[in-house]
Amino acid sequence: MKRKWNLEDTKKLFSKPFFDLIFEAQKKHREYFNPNRIQISTLLSIKTGACPEDCKYCPQSSRYKTGLKKEPLLEIEQILKAAKKAKSSGSTRFCMGAAWKNPKEKDMPYLEKIVKEVKKMGMETCMTLGTLNNSQAKKLAKAGLDFYNHNLDTSSNFYSSIITTRTYEERLSTLKKVRNSGMKICSGGIIGLGEKKQDRMELLMELSNLSIQPESVPINMLVKIPGTPMEKNENVDPFEFIRVIAATRIMMPKSYIRLSAGRENMSDETQAMCFMAGANSIFYGCKLLTSSNPKEEKDQKLFEKLDLFPDYKIQSITEENKNNENLKISDVNKAQYYNAAI
């Protein structure tokens, strides 16, 4: 029976001595996952910029002058080419994001076709397109979409300080529609928005107390983009970030926890502690829109130091991969990539 987390218990969890918390998280992690495996995702912006929303952290909002060049929907051939390269680099999941408040009905045939074509490659698929209605969720599920990303971002109490163009209830409603359609949920949040510790606790409570916990939980460290209202936010204490990762693992033991945006600003040691605390998924080998992800060579070296290997359980391992389990680097057009997690 799934545990229901309340604020008192969550506060006790967060207040544990740091090493006790990490130790508990690592034990919980080993109950459900191989600690030496990591799930690799690649993400692509299929429509960039000119978003009508006012999310204060996001460079894609049309309300802020971030210098981001807007781009129309990509051709399907461009998307499939990127997906093929992603698979060759070791990714098992291909994520696609569009800077919309919600998809229009005229876009649905295009989106459904993309899902079907990427699925033919043997990859898991994920999309983040904004809010969905029931019909759209069912169409995407029927097309074969495995995951739908729709983050809660922060606590319900702090949410209105970050976004006013979409309510918290709308986000929860979309997650419910996604779940009812049969798709899996990818939903997490951002640390560093100016929230208090209790907001972090309440975010994790909201996610963990969903009827079925998200299969994928991206935890982002705010990337401060010039031109957004949050460009001068205070830096996140790495130990506090690691504490959030550990609490996420304990509260959602069966979920993949993705160390998402902000890795470029993390030391190898911080990332290693995040993996120790239960993170077991990353976005790899791609640029996160206007912010950069660690260079492929740097990630490669870190994984080798930590003896981390990609999780190939979604796709069969080719003979080439059997001979060399280390991640392979592909020559990807980085300008097209976008942080689907935020």
Swiss-Prot record:
Q: Which reaction is the catalytic activity of this chain?
A: (4R,5S)-dethiobiotin + (sulfur carrier)-SH + 2 reduced [2Fe-2S]-[ferredoxin] + 2 S-adenosyl-L-methionine = (sulfur carrier)-H + biotin + 2 5'-deoxyadenosine + 2 L-methionine + 2 oxidized [2Fe-2S]-[ferredoxin]
Query: What's this protein's function?
Result: Catalyzes the conversion of dethiobiotin (DTB) to biotin by the insertion of a sulfur atom into dethiobiotin via a radical-based mechanism.
KW ATP-binding (keyword) present = no
Q: Which organism is it from?
A: Buchnera aphidicola subsp. Schizaphis graminum (strain Sg)
What name goes with this protein? Biotin synthase
GO MF assignments? 2 iron, 2 sulfur cluster binding; 4 iron, 4 sulfur cluster binding; biotin synthase activity; iron ion binding
What does the record give as cofactor? [4Fe-4S] cluster; [2Fe-2S] cluster
Q: Which gene encodes it?
A: bioB
What superkingdom does the record give? Bacteria
Sorted alphabetically, which HAMAP family does this protein's record hold?
BioB
| Residues engaged in binding [4Fe-4S] cluster | C51, C55, C58
On assembly, the entry states: Homodimer.
